[in-house]
């Protein structure tokens, strides 16, 4: 029996855990977005 790959991508899970709405819902998440804006990231969140 072999171990499975741990990354099984799902669009819904990705956006719910790391998405923009999730980031905006907490104060620390807003800090993350602010940092990424300050750094000049093209993509702010998943």
From Swiss-Prot:
NCBIfam families with a match to the protein in the record: rpmH_bact
PROSITE patterns, alphabetized: RIBOSOMAL_L34
Gene3D superfamilies assigned: 1.10.287.3980
Species the sequence originates in: Lactobacillus acidophilus (strain ATCC 700396 / NCK56 / N2 / NCFM)
An example Gene Ontology molecular-function term: structural constituent of ribosome
TM ranges: none
UniProt record, GO biological process: translation
One GO CC annotation: ribonucleoprotein complex
Region listing for Disordered, in residue ranges: 24-46
Compositional bias per record (Basic residues), positions renumbered to this chain: 32-46
Family that this chain belongs to: Belongs to the bacterial ribosomal protein bL34 family.
InterPro entries, per the entry: Ribosomal_bL34, Ribosomal_bL34_CS
Official protein name in the record: Large ribosomal subunit protein bL34
Pfam assignment, any one: Ribosomal_L34
UniProt keyword list: Ribonucleoprotein, Ribosomal protein
Coiled-coil spans in chain: none
């Amino acid at each position: 029996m072999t171990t499975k790959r741990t990354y099984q991508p799902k669009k819904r899970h990705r956006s719910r855990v790391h998405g923009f709405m999730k980031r905006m819902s907490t104060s620390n998440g807003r800090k993350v977005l602010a940092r990424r804006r300050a750094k000049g990231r093209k993509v702010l969140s998943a």
